[in-house]
C-alpha cells in the first residue's frame, strides 16, 4: 500500500492555507492522481478527507489550482465556515471526496433530473475516529443520499473506514440503522438545514430523502468515474476551468512530471484563531 502524506503551506484558518498531497514523497493531485480504488477486487476505495468531523472550516479540494491542494473556501474574500445547527457542532461526519470522480455539470441524472455540481463525489465517513485534513482513508461504500443543492445534484456517499471496529458489521445501508440507530436521520437533517444560518433556504433531497443502498451508490460512483475519465482525457464537452495537471497519468494531455517544482515547499504554521462567533449555536424550527 502506498503511503500518503501531506505538505502544509501556511496556517489553517487563513487565506494562504494549502494542503498538498504527497505519495511516497512525490506530489500528486488528490483529484486526479490518487486511484479511486485501493483494492478493486474487494471494493475498497480511497477517500480524501477535506473536513474532519466536528470542525467548521469549509475546506475543499481546489479545482482551479495546480495539483488541486485542499484550501478553505471563501465568499467575497472572506473565509467560509459551516455554522453550528443545534444539536450539531460543525460537520457531522469526516467529510471529503473520492479521487478520480467528477459530478459532470454537462449531464442531467435521469432520476434526480438535475445536473452534476462540478465537484469530485462527496463522501461522509461515519467511523469513530476523527480524521485529519488531507488524510487518505481506505473505505467501504454503504449507500448514498442525493442532495439537490441550489438546483444541482450533489450526491453524498456514506462510507466507513475499513479499519473501524464496526466495519466488518456494516456491509449495506440497512446495517447502518441496525448498528448506528439515528445516524442516517441525523445526517439527512444536517444536510437539509446546514445552510439556513447563512440565510439560504433548506436543501431538498431526491428520493424523499431516502438513503439508497450500496449497489445504487456503486452505480453512481461508476458514472462519476466515467465522467472524470472523459475529463482527464480532454474528451469532456466543457471542463469548467478545472486544472487537470497530474504527475502520474503519463498518457493524459495534462501530465507534467515537472509540475511539482512549481509548488511551494512546506511551511506549516500554527492555526490562526477562529472568530468566537463561529461557536454560536443556531436553533432551527423543524429540526429535530
Curated annotation (Swiss-Prot):
Pfam families from the UniProt entry: Pyrophosphatase (PF00719)
EC number(s) reported in the record: 3.6.1.1
Low complexity biased stretches: 258-271
UniProt key word Cytoplasm: yes
InterPro entries noted in UniProt: Pyrophosphatase, Pyrophosphatase_sf
Gene Ontology annotations of biological process type: phosphate-containing compound metabolic process
Binding residues for Mg(2+) 2: 122
Residues engaged in binding diphosphate: 80
GO molecular-function terms, A-Z: inorganic diphosphate phosphatase activity; magnesium ion binding
Keyword vocabulary terms for this entry: Cytoplasm, Hydrolase, Magnesium, Metal-binding
One GO cellular component term: hyphal cell wall
Binding site for Mg(2+) 1: 117, 122, 154
Location, primary (coarse class): cytoplasm
Top class in the EC scheme: hydrolase
Compartment(s): Cytoplasm
Catalytic activity: diphosphate + H2O = 2 phosphate + H(+)
Metal-binding as UniProt keyword: yes
Gene3D superfamilies listed in its UniProt record: Inorganic pyrophosphatase
Required cofactor(s): Mg(2+)
Region spans: Disordered: 252-271
Family: Belongs to the PPase family.
Miscellaneous comment in the UniProt entry for this protein: Has antigenic properties. Elicits a specific immune response in systemic candidiasis human patients undergoing malignant hematological disorders.
Protein name: Inorganic pyrophosphatase
Species in which this protein is naturally found: Candida albicans (strain SC5314 / ATCC MYA-2876)
Amino acid at each position: 500500500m502506498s503511503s500518503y502524506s501531506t505538505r502544509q503551506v501556511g496556517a489553517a484558518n487563513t487565506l494562504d492555507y494549502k494542503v498538498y498531497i504527497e505519495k511516497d514523497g512525490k506530489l500528486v493531485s488528490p483529484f486526479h492522481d490518487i486511484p479511486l480504488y485501493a483494492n478493486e477486487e474487494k471494493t475498497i476505495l480511497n477517500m480524501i478527507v477535506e473536513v474532519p468531523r466536528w470542525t467548521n472550516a469549509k475546506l475543499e479540494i481546489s479545482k482551479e489550482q495546480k495539483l488541486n491542494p485542499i484550501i478553505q473556501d471563501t465568499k467575497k474574500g472572506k473565509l467560509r465556515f459551516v455554522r453550528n445547527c443545534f444539536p450539531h457542532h460543525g460537520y457531522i461526519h469526516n467529510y471529503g471526496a473520492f479521487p478520480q470522480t467528477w459530478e459532470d455539470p454537462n449531464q442531467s441524472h435521469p432520476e434526480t433530473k438535475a445536473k452534476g455540481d462540478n465537484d469530485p463525489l462527496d463522501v461522509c465517513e461515519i467511523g469513530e475516529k476523527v480524521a485529519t485534513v488531507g488524510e487518505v482513508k481506505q473505505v467501504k461504500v454503504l449507500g448514498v443520499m442525493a442532495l439537490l443543492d441550489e438546483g444541482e445534484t450533489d450526491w453524498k456517499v456514506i462510507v466507513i473506514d475499513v479499519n473501524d471496529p464496526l466495519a466488518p458489521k456494516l456491509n449495506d445501508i440497512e446495517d447502518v440503522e441496525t448498528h448506528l440507530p439515528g445516524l442516517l436521520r441525523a445526517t439527512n437533517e444536517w444536510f437539509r438545514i446546514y445552510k439556513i444560518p447563512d440565510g439560504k433556504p433548506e436543501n431538498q433531497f431526491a428520493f424523499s430523502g431516502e438513503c439508497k443502498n450500496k449497489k445504487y451508490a456503486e452505480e453512481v460512483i461508476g458514472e462519476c468515474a466515467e465522467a472524470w475519465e472523459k475529463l482527464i482525457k480532454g474528451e469532456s464537452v466543457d471542463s469548467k476551468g478545472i486544472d487537470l495537471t497530474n504527475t502520474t497519468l503519463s498518457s493524459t494531455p495534462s501530465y507534467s512530471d515537472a509540475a511539482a517544482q512549481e509548488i511551494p515547499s512546506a511551511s506549516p504554521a500554527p492555526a490562526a484563531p477562529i472568530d468566537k462567533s463561529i461557536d454560536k449555536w443556531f436553533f432551527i424550527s423543524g429540526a429535530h
